[in-house]
Amino acid sequence: SHVQAVASKAGIIRTEKAFEGIIYKGVGKDYNFTNLEEYLVDGKIPNLKSELNTEVLISEYLAKRLHLKVGDKFLTFFMKENGKLPNKRNFLITGIFNSGFQEFDATYVIGDIRHVQLINKWNSTDVGAFEVFVDDFSKKKKKGDDVYKEIPPTYNSITIEEKFYSIFEW
């Protein structure tokens, strides 16, 4: 098993030619990119081991819609509450992936969790969720139940099948 911290933030990527709504998935130094590496179609995995940087993975689907490629920079706007001016972040594409799951590919950009922490004014220990990976996929339900029993009642635990029901329903 492997546990990794993540935090997500909705945003809008704007280029000279297009714009797309996205979810920026912030991941930490402990993130296991092994599963994503097999879906890499160009470039490389971002280096999140050192200080905060702007390197991200973007899907082939989003890259095509936004006319972007590895090495390109793009601007992302993250909305603030109360109608204040949005936070802006420039990101650098180091890799392009194609997972084959349209729901995922049309939505997610993956980069440094510290951007989400800064935008949300969180501490460096604050995260949005923990992802728990199991060695045996057939035991995911039991692991999900075990986690649920151990967390405070104000938290929730769901399996990947529950989160992405439409992918697994077939």
For each feature predicted by the language model, list its residue ranges.
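Extracytoplasmic/periplasmic
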Residues: 1-3
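Mechanotransmission and gating elements of multispan inner-membrane complexes involved in transport
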Residues: 85-170
